[in-house]
């Protein structure tokens, strides 16, 4: 959702207070609070990388509130012309950030600079783990690592500003990170590599589920979950899950 938030800040030139970081668990509460705050003057509500429930949609429609949804989770498909649920785009997996970017560009809220295209593509490859090359995997891992270091709010503000710089031709494609960030990312990845490599067939429990050889990994720190899974399956292809 951070990529979508950066696009909202940049594309709509809006204030941070108008962008909310929601999960399926707190979405209804946030929408309810904004409906109470704005009354009959609630502006168009945009949902990206998260889909409102049928109950939320019913409340918005009852109040006559305009809304749009940009999501790539097929399980969230709901009957409404305002909802764009796409798992694929141009023949490959897509994500909420890419769907939102396409709409913003088509409606002239932003122009698709090379920097913007690279930023969105890195997020897409990471979000759906669709890596076309080792280089693509590395770029995605670096951006995700910076996200972990900065946290969602700082990451969003930093890249909303960089998108603005790129729009003014003050930042080029490939200039995703500054020198300090590159050093911080490198140090963090070194530390993460030690954790990831510590998981081997000898250190995990193995069970068979519906004919699939499955590794049960206990990660007490709760970090790098996707990377541990991805690296483990790549190193030990005899496992299915």
Show where each model-derived region lies.
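Eukaryote-specific, cytoplasm-facing alpha-helical/coiled-coil scaffolding segments in long proteins
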Residues: 150-151
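Long, charge-rich alpha-helical interaction segments
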Residues: 154-191
């Amino acid at each position: 959702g951070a990529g979508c938030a950066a696009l909202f800040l940049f594309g709509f030139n809006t204030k941070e207070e108008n962008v909310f970081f929601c999960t399926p668990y707190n979405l209804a509460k946030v929408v309810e609070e904004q409906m109470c705050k704005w009354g009959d003057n609630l502006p168009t509500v945009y949902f990206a990388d998260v889909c409102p429930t049928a109950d939320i949609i019913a409340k918005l429609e009852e109040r006559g509130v305009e809304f749009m949804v940009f999501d790539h989770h097929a399980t969230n498909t709901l009957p409404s012309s305002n909802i764009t649920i796409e798992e694929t785009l141009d023949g490959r997996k897509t994500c909420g950030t890419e769907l939102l970017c396409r709409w913003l560009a088509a409606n002239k809220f932003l122009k698709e600079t090379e920097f913007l295209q690279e930023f969105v593509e890195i997020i897409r490859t990471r979000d759906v783990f669709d890596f076309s090359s080792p280089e693509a995997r590395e770029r995605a891992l670096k951006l995700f690592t910076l996200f972990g270091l900065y946290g969602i709010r700082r990451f969003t503000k930093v890249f909303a500003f960089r998108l603005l710089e790129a729009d003014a031709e003050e930042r080029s494609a490939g200039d995703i990170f500054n020198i300090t960030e590159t050093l911080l990312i490198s140090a963090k990845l070194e530390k993460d590599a030690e954790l990831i490599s510590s998981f081997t067939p000898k250190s995990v429990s193995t069970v068979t589920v519906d004919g699939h050889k499955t590794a049960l990994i206990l990660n007490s720190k709760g970090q790098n979950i996707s990377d541990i899974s991805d690296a483990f399956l790549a190193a030990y292809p005899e496992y299915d899950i």
